[in-house]
Amino acid sequence: MVILLTSSLTSLVRRLQLEKKDFVKYLGVLIDYELSWKNHINLICLKISRTVGILAKLRHSIPLRPLLNIYQALINPYLYYGICAWGSAPKTYLNNLLFIQKRVLRLIYFMDYKQHAVPFFLNSKVFPLSFIYFDCLCSIMWNVANNSAPENIKRAFTRISEVHSYPTRSSLNDDFYTEHSRLEKMRVGPKIWNSLPSDMRNLPKSTFRKKIRNMLFEILSKSDDYLEITEIMHQLN
């Protein structure tokens, strides 16, 4: 399925008169007026840095597996929550989170701070930040394609087949797109979805998620690098 943004969101914002603030907190996410996500990412860094200190002490007294369980329980939730929104932030901010990810895994494995960390991500079955973003966008786009996403999210996208009255390669593949250039950051979801093999997009949700995770770990292993979203998509071709 290929995926298009509708005008309802833009029209709603124009009708509202809002008090300007540097940022607001909504459902646990700090949204700044420039949509840079700097405040929210700084908050995540602060919260997970506390866990890094805990793990640095515990690693001397408990085995590897419980340490990784603590990572999954106390760090991963902050990285996954709302990432479909803030994962489009500038690389300058996102790199701070990736740095903490690498630091904590090196601590868990008792490795030097300069040690290449990709093998630790693979061994721990943990995604670097950009891979988390890719994984979560795949999940939400599956929901959009299968009409199980919330209405306000579904309205942001349009199927190519709903635009063209004649058959196109994209319409036959059930591709999606978004409409407005001002919402360019939201285009990454359809781009990712449209880059996936059609047979994968037609899988049930649980099988689809498993295939995506396996595919991402394979890409991480082959590239041995922290690829950006566009670089991950190129690996699919």
Which residues fall in each region the model found?
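Amphipathic alpha-helical interface elements that mediate macromolecular binding in regulatory proteins
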Residues: 24, 42, 46-49, 53, ...
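Short, conserved catalytic/metal-binding micro-motifs enriched in Asp/Glu and His
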Residues: 24-34, 48, 75, 79-86, ...
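Basic, alpha-helical interaction scaffolds
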Residues: 18-85
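Short, charged alpha-helical motifs in flexible N/C-terminal segments and linkers
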Residues: 84, 93-162
